[in-house]
Amino acid sequence: MAMWIQAQQLQGDALHQMQALYGQHFPIEVRHYLSQWIESQAWDSIDLDNPQENIKATQLLEGLVQELQKKAEHQVGEDGFLLKIKLGHYATQLQNTYDRCPMELVRCIRHILYNEQRLVREANNGSSPAGSLADAMSQKHLQINQTFEELRLITQDTESELKKLQQTQEYFIIQYQESLRIQAQFAQLAQLNPQERMSRETALQQKQVSLETWLQREAQTLQQYRVELAEKHQKTLQLLRKQQTIILDDELIQWKRRQQLAGNGGPPEGSLDVLQSWCEKLAEIIWQNRQQIRRLEHLCQQLPIPGPVEEMLAEVNATITDIISALSTSTFIIEKQPPQVLKTQTKFAATVRLLVGGKLNVHMNPPQVKATIISEQQAKSLLKNENTRNDYSGEILNNCCVMEYHQATGTLSAHFRNMSLKRIKRSDRRGAESVTEEKFTILFDSQFSVGGNELVFQVKTLSLPVVVIVHGSQDNNATATVLWDNAFREPGRVPFAVPDKVLWPQLCEALNMKFKAEVQSNRGLTKENLVFLAQKLFNSSSNHLEDYNSMSVSWSQFNRENLPGRNYTFWQWFDGVMEVLKKHLKPHWNDGAILGFVNKQQAHDLLINKPDGTFLLRFSDSEIGGITIAWKFDSQERMFWNLMPFTTRDFSIRSLADRLGDLNYLIYVFPDRPKDEVYSKYYTPVPCERATAKAADGYVKPQIKQVVPEFVNASTDAGSGATYMDQAPSPVVCPQAHYNMYPQNPDSVLDTDGDFDLEDTMDVARRVEELLGRPMDSQWIPHAQS
């Protein structure tokens, strides 16, 4: 069912909330008449922080205006006349409003659609059994909303009590003035004759005694009212503090944790809109109570009555100031983090947001935010409130930005779009620590006032740890530092402490999360894959994942010490696997055509009972980012064959699918899938031209093919009658009359015992590709394509 149809079925408060989303910035009539068109557009695909996306936003604005104009033109009849005028007016209005800022239209409609979906979900969940509540409306969120309702009612009650107290006090003051008037009348009695004076004096005395008795009683009542009201405020503040703790220390901290895990490839942290609505409700209720407390203080000053209320009010006033201070400083957050691997002299972006900016009217005098980079030690000093003013670790260009208020969404934020780290000052490193293990952070700070400069707040927030690099070759190791920090940092830590060791299952979870995100695949690491990785990391032969569950992995094992017998670390090897999959092999991994995480012996064990021509692809043990083909073909010389690993460089010349297509003797993808069934959809189409056909410039275009000459010879010697593409005649080149590009002596790609030695191997395929990739000499003799 369309979202707008469901939204129209909302009732009560949900309906009012939905209606409040619309106004002059986006009329509800536009939503109604263009509902289908609006819901079919890809609003979420536009990056609001990327100025280059402005073209897409402009196209959406133009499309919206055109659809409105079309809808207006189709209105006929008496009833349609007014609607035609109205829709035409809205088209002009939206064009004028968003013509210079089309991104704001996208932001506005995204905000509307998100909240409509939320309201519909909440309404549907409310009518469902308690056990089937959706994630958007958890039991905890229900409790938060119930507490807000309780706070609203309590605040209404104290407002009524305050008005009642004010009326009572005003009447008391009137009566007190009456008692003063009676005292003045006593002074005038001396002017009267004795008989009249005595008569008037008796009446005045009776009236005075009665009034003073009332005043004494009412003074006690007023004092009691004041104390009771102060006690109610104390209870309100206790509930407010508890609610604020849940929102800031639980919900907001959880959002920040999700944001950090998203840096490792976890699910997106989610919108801040719900959190902002809670923070705004907190701000509104806190401010209402603060104003009530101030009015109560004013009443006490207006009519001083000795008692404990002055001390109580001083306490609640200090408490509520602390509460609003904590709310203001804690809701100054980084909505979009800067990159955690930060290269100098490279543009980067970030967004900070104040969740209570709209409710506290901060946007009336927009504050400026400044970004600076500080070291780990400087961050520690900052949190200890030590003086770190002007103590920075580098220079950031374009590091100041004024916060902007977006009326449609009610957000106050600063978008840093063109920052660049000009230089970095590194600290002395400890022991074996490398530059890619040194952590920095971006400090965002600002100052703003609320309540007409009544309260002034200095706010600061730190980004997630960043590792600064100066060259792309450092990216791999810097990413390892970020991954470890994001995955294993503990709550409430001192910047930026992380455990030196973690359990293997914890690392498995982090690796799987990163793997799926980098490769952009739902096919993550299986139990068998994790066993292989554990064997590699711990240099173990156990095939049971449970055997590794209690084992710890140190940071040094992860990315400081090389693997046994290798010149690279565990992380560097794993990152190379992700890199080659992401750039060239993603569809094949998703198809399940790459087994990947098996060693040479395991590959042979898997192939031993398979028919000749069965092959599998596995990640190379010897070369970072390499993938090799292992296949079975029982010849006189050997049974298993292993091709020299391909890397990203090879696949940028010729794809894996085309390379496999060239090797006709590879028939089945392990375990038993026909090769062409798996890979044919990825083959590069071959033009239907005669091989001898000449191009316009007189040259013949060569073709690159994957060949394994030694295997051709071995398979022929074994009695194979197949005709291979690899056996096509090689081109000849002068000065040798018949230079054989594929010599018949034993080839270094495949060694005689079936083991591949990287150091002693020549990559024939690469040599051929490089040769064919050069400008053609006129002495090349073309041959027909086989």
Curated annotation (Swiss-Prot):
Superkingdom field:
Eukaryota
One GO MF term: DNA binding
Localization per record? Cytoplasm; Nucleus
Q: What is the source species?
A: Rattus norvegicus
What is this protein called in UniProt? Signal transducer and activator of transcription 5B
Top-down, what is the taxonomic lineage of the species of origin?
Answer: Eukaryota, Metazoa, Chordata, Craniata, Vertebrata
**Oligomeric form and interacting partners:** Upon activation, forms a homodimer or a heterodimer with a related family member. Binds NR3C1. Interacts with NCOA1. Interacts with NMI. Interacts with SOCS7. Interacts (via SH2 domain) with INSR. Interacts with CPEB3; this inhibits STAT5B-mediated transcriptional activation.
Name the GO cellular-component terms.
Answer: cytoplasm; cytosol; nucleus; RNA polymerase II transcription regulator complex
Underlying gene:
Stat5b
Instruction: Tell me which Pfam families the record gives.
Output: SH2, STAT_alpha, STAT_bind, STAT_int, STAT_linker
